[in-house]
Amino acid sequence: MKEVNAPLSESVVYWMRCEHRSQDNWALLYALQKADEKKLPFVVLFSLAASTPNCSYRQKKFLFDGLEELKRSLEKHGVFFVNADVETPEELAERIKEMSPHLLVTDHSSLKPQRKWLETVAYHTLCSVVEVDGRNVVPLRAVSDKQEYAARTIRPKIHRMLEQFLVPFPSLSKLEGHAASFFSDPLTAPLAGKDASTAVSSFVPGEKAARTIFSTFVKEKVHQYLERNDPTKDALSNLSPYLHFGMISAQRIVLDMLENKQVPVEAKEVFLEELVVRRELADNFCFFNPHYDSPQCFPQWAQKTLAKHRADPREHVYSLKEFEEGNTHDSLWNAAQWELVHQGKMHGYMRMYWAKKILEWTATPEDAMRYAIYLNDTYSLDGVDANGYTGVAWSIGGVHDRPWRERAIFGTVRYMNYAGAKRKFKVDVYIQKIAMASGRLLT
């Protein structure tokens, strides 16, 4: 993204800001290769503020708690880990300049805050800057140069290029020579109390935990993945927090899944559709649509139909506080909110129901979008993510969807209700399970 001749060439720096792992990391491998070619010291640079802009305490704490393991793993391979305790991209750029890098390598992100950090750092540094897409199996810019309309338009583009990019990872060998030595700030835990979230124990952070969860999914759960839309079944992979923070590679998951002959073909196909096509569609949406976090991102048909029904009477209108506390008339919605607050992750099917009901029970689509994004980005370990923003935009504003039968409030945006959920799964079982797990009394 930036090519200049550095006045001094004393190191190669990999600024790790999205893909927080030592294994199966294309940016790390590329930066190491360049350091070896130039016979220069190599360093991995980390900043909690740079890795978590707009994140809540819960998300920062989850990432932070996996850092010691990451640091040890890198140092075991001879890679020097530098922590920069800074708050702004300008401060980070100053730390980078102190290292006099020949090259700065960093991770791809489609989100505005992360892109702003990179833009500012690149502007203030005096070396070439390369951004490596380690999030997507097929790199975002290789797939398309525009916002894709739906999964059906991006799917063939991804499938055509999948074989080209779905290659084995080289192993990370121990770095010999070219040792780096730069000042590193002590790892300091984020401060609690700056928002409503608290740390959760539902998920153990780090690469090792991510690999264990994936292994458990393949051995014990993937056979029932076709029942993933039933929240009473333990059929989900639960990998989204780890994928969000780059503690495991999506490409590694795909490679291992394709090689596994024990996984049923249909379950494998559906899982890979979610992991590759749907996930990369979300990244495409956020990269090419700067309004991904507001109703301006909705397709024209959805904007028109929601405007037409804007003044429709609402039987229930809740405040953000009532939503946050799971204090609505709908016990199913409340359970989904409790799951989010107390476990740090909501079941995938319930995320759709949850967001659509926020539209139904707020005065405007703008309020609905704002509330849903706030709640997801505050409480979900995989919040502040392209998948989350796209999911909210799909639920509330028909992004990547089509018009349905017209009704009050929703217009022709797809509708979901309690009766439909009851037909799909045992609602009472889900509510009871979440109430017990979150220590709630059912009334």
Model regions and ranges:
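Glycine/tryptophan-enriched, flexible segments
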Residues: 140, 146-301, 424-443
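Generic alpha-helical secondary structure signal
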Residues: 61-68, 90-94, 119, 148, ...
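Trp/Phe/Arg-rich N-terminal binding region typifying the photolyase-homology
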Residues: 1-169, 173, 338, 360-362, ...
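Short low-complexity stretches enriched in small and charged residues
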Residues: 1-5, 57-63, 199, 207-210, ...
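Active-site-proximal binding-pocket segments
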Residues: 18, 232-431, 436-437
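Alpha-helical packing segments of well-folded alpha/beta enzyme cores
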Residues: 27, 66, 70, 210-217, ...
